[in-house]
């Protein structure tokens, strides 16, 4: 995967998605700003303080892998992008908060699911073999795990295990 441009020029990720989605907001950048995040659209900012928790309910204190861009769809779904060129080996992550950050529980593995685009351009559910957060012992998708990103690797289980949602604790 080559480094993706998340900015405003032609050919950027923003323009790629804008062609295919009717979106209410397309972010040029998501940036930390005094403890809040802002979706920047041209010269307008939408400020918010996203509070996400792990699968077991612990607060996620580091949202660095959610901060390279975002799209808010007309129905409120929030799609985050992470272009990890450099720090994680040119991996591209897509995180989807299916009901948006204004609706709870905002919990990894419950209403927030992550995907990775691999070196061959395949979209993989996080937790599948070959993804960055794959772990045979489920340390990134276990209601008992204390990992900082516990729940980030649950997309694979949610797709492949028909009882996944029945077994989730509220």
Stretch-by-stretch model annotation:
Residues 16-170:
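Intrinsically disordered, low-complexity regions enriched in Pro/Ser/Thr/Gly and acidic residues
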